[in-house]
UniProtKB/Swiss-Prot annotation:
Protein known as: Lysine-specific demethylase phf2
Species whose genome carries this gene: Dicentrarchus labrax (European seabass)
Gene3D superfamilies referenced in this protein's UniProt entry, alphabetically: 1.20.58.1360, Cupin (2.60.120.650), Zinc/RING finger domain, C3HC4 (zinc finger) (3.30.40.10)
Modified residues (Phosphoserine): S1022
Keywords: Activator, Centromere, Chromatin regulator, Chromosome, Dioxygenase, Iron, Kinetochore, Metal-binding, Nucleus, Oxidoreductase, Phosphoprotein, Transcription, Transcription regulation, Zinc, Zinc-finger
Binding of Fe cation, residues: H249, E251, N321
Length: 1081
């Protein structure tokens, strides 16, 4: 029976859980615990000899250290940087001199460190307490030592141990570390800094300072029944041996920290958290070799503070600190976040998130603590307001910072990252809204109280960078007349400084100051805009043009109302002797204002805008064009935030819209519109950026109707354009306006009810568009080809009646007089377009509801078109259809998106509406051939519907080939597979699409077109319809080449390809290519 091998001096079998080392002499294996070799020390041993071999071979030899840096790659010390924490580093650090911390550290007794002191002086500098008396701090007896820690916490508790020399950490049981601590031969410098004992027996004998317990968010605001447990950061035990060093760091979560030295001594190196120092710290910490750079060398000042036995040090949030232990030390500490340094805590937290640094003392669920604090602050603010009290300024500022962070964390793109720390049963959006409202109330009341003692002009502080646009002040929340009186008094002092402000008008940093007071502030801003002198003539045109582009309809009523208020209230506000009288009037009207506020906030925004526009219609402005334009433009540029206190809870979205409006470019032209015989400047620009907010569009579409009837003849002199001036002068290609067609169409739908439908719009479009439109056609196809097309149509189940050809005939005769000029205009539009090709797809988009209207009706309407012109909205850029023509054609909308990038499509500004009939003379484009497509389609249709006509078609093929040399037509292939398939692909889209839309078929007598834009009798390369200019161009060129190839090999190409034997198979293949179910041209 085989025996189990045994090892080591203890002669025990191999144990996988124990570390073993091999002797280089006897080749036996020994347990590290038996021969006194630690696992961490083994890599440093070069040749190992067991205790038995040491007698004959000598002691074990260690590897030679080339450098104190942990990168011991054999380089000399003068080349390699010194590693932070190494023996060389500690020796040099001890010998250096630093500025004394007496300049920055505040020394207080325990009784002086109170909540009132911190609220009055803040907690921005370190505080040192010489004794623990009065701090409310509980500590063990001075005889308490490391072995007692082991007894209270437990010997088997795992702790993170930092190897100071290498600045690395490893796991170790507390019992093993205590053994190391008491050993006389310490081969390494080990440090324990994160032994958190709040859930152990030692928790009862250590109590944090009372001021910390009063400030701590975790202690006060974290619910006991929360699903997420409280962060365990309040009580740490620090066991540090001599020469322990912790490199520069900021506490996690921007937490403040307190230290109390029970035994020994600690030296703190402190750096102020200025913006420059924080930026330097972030750069240093993110570098790969930061462990070889002493951070204190990069900043202007690093203070040295020695904390001796029995002393307590409080380090504020954000301070960058490093810690050196000159002698063995036992200390206690704890981290806490609080309301006094919310801004710095958030900043430090953001730095921590960006650095993604792994730390031994994290602050878990920091964002969850913030949510609980936000809920607490909301309840606290509400209670204070009900008791006619105001929160402390640091609370208001902290609430604004927290609310801003809430908004950032709940954004759509950031929600996934932050939703794990969102507390249960918390409604973030409601909390943000309510907290913003309470902040606004507190800010306004606080500013009013500050300005109450003196009537002098108060110095307005610039708004905080973290401040958010808040909710409007509701009079219902104003608790007492005293606050109201204070607010009115605060509204008066800002009046005198109006004269010095106008020179700063072109700048935009002033608006945030305006909402200082609810009503008075608004009037002040409005009056400033009204009374300011006009700018230089050189900048006036730019200002006026800029105003036209950025003013939207939702703002115009408010601006006009603002001017009206200024004119009506100016005398009151100039005199300073009416304070009491004004106050009494406002007190009497308080209920009215309250009801009006509630009424406004209970209604949708659109209703409020429409009501204000009715007031705008009744408002008469005294002043000339210059004054009006200047006021309106500056109202937008300088007073955008002034308008906001009037709005309801959607103030955040509205402010965002205003911000986007400000970035729009200055228009280089004015837009004019004609309405009911009167002319006025169109204050609502037609072209808009693509990033226009949808909410803006809905406002415009809802409000356009009441504003449109212009009843103020005072605006008439502003117009410089003639009624009879040609609309051609204002035509321009605007590719950016295409996404806006739908929203503008919706406006016209509401006011186009009096029009006679799409026919009147078609007639109107011809006049709006000028002479740039062509509706003429060309001679139709031959009768034999017509029969082939009829066969194809019957196979595709497309109905066709003879009467449907009449529109083409009538429009042919009707437009003969304009054929030459129109065709030239179309050519110019095609060649001058480029990127505007998708506009030429509009004819088929606008016409699907009009397939069966005869041209006799159209002719009668054409004679009466002048009667309908006044009821139709006419625009130089767009012509809008009536209500029924926009809804049933999703396929065309998707098609227009696909072809936006075409570079060679023809373009005409008026090609959106009008009958889709053939054009006469159009220029040929290289490589665009249609004849092969026509013959292939005709052949496939003929074989399907008339089998007996196949022989006739084959007989004609020879004569067709002879003619091809003269007229440049590729040979006609009836049964070969390559060319007909590609021809069918691009051609029957034209056929079927126009059958659905215009219904043009043959009529007896004379050559007829097989489909609009396709004629077999005249061989022209450019025969493709505007709807398929991109696809047909590429397909025709390929089919031309293929047709030539197949024509040359006609003798041996009698055999058909698989799946192409019959026209039905070929047609099925074509239909599969067009996956949207339509045959598109």
């Amino acid at each position: 029976m085989a025996t189990v091998p045994v090892y080591c001096i203890c002669r025990l079998p191999y144990d996988v859980t124990q570390f073993m080392i091999e002797c280089d002499a006897c080749k036996d294996w020994f347990h590290g615990s038996c021969v006194g070799v630690d696992e961490d020390d083994a890599p440093d041993i070069d040749i190992y000899h067991c205790p038995n071999c040491e007698k004959t071979h000598g002691k074990s030899t260690l590897k030679k250290k080339k450098n104190w840096s942990k990168h011991d790659t054999g380089q000399s010390t003068d080349i390699k940087a010194v590693q932070n924490g190494s023996q060389v580093f500690i020796k040099e650090l001890r010998s250096r001199t630093f500025p004394s911390a007496d300049d920055v550290v505040v020394k207080l007794s325990g009784s002086q460190l109170t909540m009132d002191y911190l609220e009055e002086n803040g907690f921005n500098e370190p505080i040192l307490a010489q004794k623990k008396d009065g701090l409310g701090l509980s500590m063990p007896a001075p005889t308490f030592y490391i072995s007692d820690v082991e007894n209270y916490v437990g010997p088997d508790v795992g702790v993170d141990v930092v190897d100071v020399t290498k600045q690395t950490d490893s796991k170790m049981k507390l019992k093993e570390f205590v053994d190391y601590y008491y050993s006389t031969n310490r081969k390494k410098v080990l440090n324990v800094i994160n032994l958190e004992f709040s859930d152990t027996r030692m928790n009862s004998i250590v109590e944090s300072p009372q001021i910390v317990r009063r400030l701590s968010w975790v202690e006060n605001y974290w619910p006991d029944d929360a699903l997420l447990g409280k962060p365990k950061v309040t009580k740490y035990c620090l066991i540090c041996v001599k020469d322990s060093y912790t490199d520069f760091h900021i506490e996690c979560g921007g937490a403040s920290v307190w230290y109390h030295v029970l035994k020994g001594e600690k030296i703190f190196f402190l750096i102020k958290p200025t913006s420059a120092n924080l930026s330097l710290y972030e750069r240093w910490r993110s570098s790969s070799n930061h462990s070889e750079m002493f951070f204190a060398d990069q900043v202007d000042k690093c203070y040295k503070c020695t904390l001796k036995q029995g002393q307590t040090l409080f380090i504020p949030s954000g301070w960058i600190n490093a810690i050196l232990t000159p002698v063995d030390c036992l200390a206690f500490s704890g981290h806490f976040v609080h309301n006094l340094s919310v801004e710095m805590q958030m900043r430090a937290y953001e730095i921590e998130k960006r650095l993604k640094v792994k730390t031994l003392t994290p602050f878990p669920n920091f964002e969850t603590a913030c949510w609980y604090v936000g809920r607490h602050l909301l309840e606290r603010f509400k209670g204070l307001h009900k008791a006619n009290k105001q929160p402390a300024p640091y609370l208001i500022h902290g609430a604004k910072i927290i609310n801003g962070a809430f908004r950032a964390w709940t954004k759509k793109q950031a929600l996934l990252e932050h939703e794990d720390e969102l507390p249960e049963n918390m409604k973030p959006s409601q909390l943000i809204k309510d907290l913003a409202k309470e902040i606004r109330l507190s800010e306004n009341a606080t500013k009013a109280i500050k300005s109450e003692p003196s009537i002098k002009v108060p110095v307005e502080e610039p708004p905080s960078t973290h401040s958010e646009p808040e909710e409007p002040v509701s009079p219902a929340h104003v608790p007492s007349p005293s606050r109201e009186k204070a607010r009115k008094k605060a509204s008066k002092p800002p009046k005198p400084p109006k004269p010095p402000k106008p020179p700063k008008m072109p700048k935009a940093p002033k608006p945030p100051k305006v909402p200082k007071v609810k009503e008075g502030g608004k009037k002040k801003a409005k009056k400033v805009k009204e009374s300011s002198p006009p700018p230089k003539p050189s900048s006036f045109a730019a200002l006026e043009s800029h105003a036209k582009d950025i003013l939207s309809k939702m703002d115009q009523p408010k601006k006009t109302k603002a001017v009206k208020n200024v004119l009506s209230m100016s005398e009151k506000e100039i005199s300073k002797q009416n304070n009491l009288e004004k106050f009494e009037i406002r007190e009497q009207n308080k209920n009215k204002t309250e009801a009006k506020w509630k009424y406004k906030n209970s209604k949708p925004d659109s209703l409020l805008k429409m009501e204000e526009e009715c007031k705008f219609d009744r408002t008469l402005l005294s002043g000339n064009k210059d004054k009006f334009s200047f006021t309106m433009s500056h109202k937008k540029m300088l007073g955008s935030k002034t308008l906001k206190p009037q709005t309801n809870s959607s103030v955040f979205g509205s402010l965002q819209n205003l911000k986007e409006d400000k970035t729009k470019p200055v228009r280089d032209e004015y837009e004019y519109v004609s309405d009911e015989g009167e002319l006025k400047i169109d204050e609502f620009p037609i072209r808009r950026k693509k990033n226009t907010v949808k909410r803006d569009q809905s406002f415009l579409s809802d409000i356009r109707e009441p504003i449109q009837p212009a009843k103020k003849p005072k605006f008439q002199p502003l117009v410089t354009k003639n009624v009879d001036s040609s609309d051609e002068e204002t035509l321009h290609i605007d590719t950016e306006a295409k996404p806006e067609v739908k929203s503008r169409n919706s406006k016209v739908k509401k006011k186009g009810g009096s029009a006679a439908g799409i026919l009147d719009l078609l007639q109107a479009s011809k006049q709006v568009g000028g002479i740039d439109y062509s509706t003429n056609s060309q001679p139709p196809a031959s009768p034999s080809t017509q029969e082939a097309i009829q066969g194809m149509l019957s196979m595709a189940n497309l109905s066709s009646s003879d009467s449907l050809q009449q529109p083409w005939s009538n429009s042919q005769s009707k437009n003969n007089s304009q054929s030459k000029s129109n065709s030239h205009g179309a050519q110019g539009g095609k060649k001058g377009s480029g990127g505007g090709g998708n506009n030429s797809k509009r004819p088929t988009k606008r016409l699907p509801k009009k397939p069966r209207k005869s041209s006799s009706i159209e002719s009668l309407d054409y004679d009466d078109d002048q009667d309908h012109m006044d009821a139709c909205f006419k625009d130089s850029d767009y012509v809008y259809p009536s209500l029924e023509s926009e809804e049933d054609n999703p396929v065309f909308k998707s098609r227009s998106k696909k072809r936006k990038s075409s570079d060679d499509t023809p373009y005409s500004p008026t090609a959106r509406v009008g009958p889709s009939v053939p054009r006469q003379e159009r220029p040929a484009r290289d490589g665009a051939r249609v004849a092969s497509i026509e013959t292939g389609l005709a052949a496939a249709a003929a074989k399907l519907s008339h089998q007996e006509e196949q022989q006739k078609t084959k007989k004609k093929k020879k004569s067709t080939k002879k003619k091809a040399i003269v007229i440049e037509e590729p040979p006609k292939i009836s049964q070969d597979s390559s060319s007909p398939e590609h021809n069918l692909d691009s051609q029957d889209g034209s056929l079927t699409d126009h059958e659905f839309n215009t219904g043009t078929v043959k009529s007896p007598g004379g050559p007829q077109p097989m489909a609009p834009g396709v004629f077999l009798s005249q061989r022209r390369p450019s025969m493709s319809s505007p709807n398929n200019s991109t696809n047909s161009t590429s397909t025709n060129s390929s089919s031309m080449a293929k047709g030539d190839r197949v024509g040359s090999a006609d003798a041996k190409a009698k055999r058909l390809k698989k799946g192409m034997a019959t026209a039905k198979q070929r047609l099925g293949k074509i239909l599969k290519i067009h996956r949207n179910g339509k045959l598109l041209l």
